[in-house]
Design a protein with these regions (language model features):
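Catalytic cores of secreted/periplasmic lytic hydrolases that degrade extracellular macromolecules
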Residues: 1-88, 92-218
């Protein structure tokens, strides 16, 4: 890997790892709450508020639903995204951090918005189109927004469902290609999935997937 790519990985990977670590902490608290409920115990007010706030953030319906069902839905959305996938998507969208959006606006993932207060007009936007590229104060905020996007947007429902199947089956995301295949809606380019898979393997990004044993939580 050349110097620019190395520098990009050195800057972005710790932020990705931090996001996944936060998700692991949330998952464990949800699992603990679920186990508590399964013993027919009542959750503390703090835990109830915690679950309600997460449900709002991750667009999970709570009205007239048992808390265990709410937690089960949250566990589908609140799960890690393998480091290699996040790195590859960021590298692809930002030209390994060299794009104008990345250098001037901390926008690594090319996320769209229609909010004029949070976006800039892309240079090659087609006439009549109104989308903007979301900008961020820090790279951390860009990565955080990407995680929320993948973990909540309906376009990535297939990704989340497969991730749950893998999680339930063997708790290991060793074959990231399977997950990348479910991110075809991320871009209009029909070859997008193949491009991301190539970036992962050509740059041996899966070597970063086991950092901090991120993939061992139940």
């Amino acid at each position: 890997i050349n110097e620019r790519k190395n520098e990009f990985i050195n800057i972005v990977l710790p932020i990705i790892v931090d996001q996944n670590r936060k998700i692991i902490v949330l998952r464990q608290r949800l699992i603990d709450s679920k186990n508590y409920l399964n013993q027919n115990k009542t959750l503390s007010q703090t835990d109830q508020v915690f679950i309600k706030n997460l449900a709002t953030k991750y667009s999970v319906t709570t009205k007239n639903r048992h808390k265990i069902d709410i937690i089960n839905d949250l566990l589908i959305s609140i799960d890690i995204i393998p480091n290699s996938i996040v790195l590859a998507q960021a590298a692809n969208e930002s030209g390994w951090g060299s794009s104008r959006f990345a250098t001037e606006f901390n926008a690594l993932f090319g996320e769209y918005t229609y909010d004029i207060n949070n976006g800039i007009i892309p240079a090659r936007r087609e006439e009549g189109k109104k989308h903007l590229v979301k900008y961020f104060k820090t790279i951390d905020k860009s990565v955080e927004s990407y995680f929320i996007n993948i973990n909540t947007h309906f376009a990535y429902d297939k990704f989340r469902k497969l991730r749950k199947i893998i999680r339930d089956k063997n708790n290991s995301f060793n074959n990231v290609d399977l997950l990348v295949d479910k991110l075809d809606a991320y871009a209009v380019n029909d070859e997008y999935v193949d491009i991301i898979i190539s970036i992962i393997h050509d740059n041996e990004l899966t070597q970063y997937d086991n950092i901090l044993s991120l993939l061992t939580i139940s």
